[in-house]
């Protein structure tokens, strides 16, 4: 009678040990499956990175990368609101807003890496507190279909926005909420004899030049596609990358590098200070600067690489070559002066331009 009870006891022990072993072998994997949250623009950028860039990093590190979508201003506000207990680990911001984030103490210094060393000099932020993940410039875009129907020549200058024949056909992003709008205004201001330290010429000339032609001031560029489709928009500030996205959707738009030049626009990344996973966050940030990550972003989302070692072929290589040509007449703006004066400019813009 002892044998069956011993047998049952041994069997029960074996089962218990097997269950324990299974749980032990599973627990490290479960513990390692962490989630990193990254703030960035929604739409094309989010789809590109989620669908084609993050996967290799997620697989190699057994983690999940989740996008918190929003404009640069939205992402900055979220980071600032949770400064002492960050909900995000990394964030992408337009360069001007990134300088504000750095000034607010929201970013950790980038850790040294080969990818960081390889970047274009213009893609490295002061003190390496952030780094550019892609580069571009704000110039002019136009509705090719409308121009063809009207027999208009393609625009060549920022001052074409003031041509009376475009009355009610110009769409302009708000200076107060859009880097494209800010760039467009500042380059117009320079043509009028101003500088970032003196925007009086631009504000003074606007109501009698570009102002009368503007159909609508839009908070972001999201509405541009719709206004091109409906035949409302003839011309607007935009980047070659954004134009490429619209063309991929079948919209009749083209980019023009104005003869006065364009404004350099870099999308930067920074690791958020005091985040819950600093080591993984820095590892992700370094990966996103690598030629491999940037090649995927270029191929699938026309994101122009900040790392010149990124390999490109076919149409992507042609795009990079064209962008390098545009960069020859692209100009940088003074973000320190801009950020110091932006609140006053925004208030004046809202009161005198968008009233």
Give a label for each model feature:
Residues 141-146, 186-191, 265-278, 296-299:
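A bilobed periplasmic-binding-protein/Venus flytrap-type ligand-binding module shared by bacterial periplasmic
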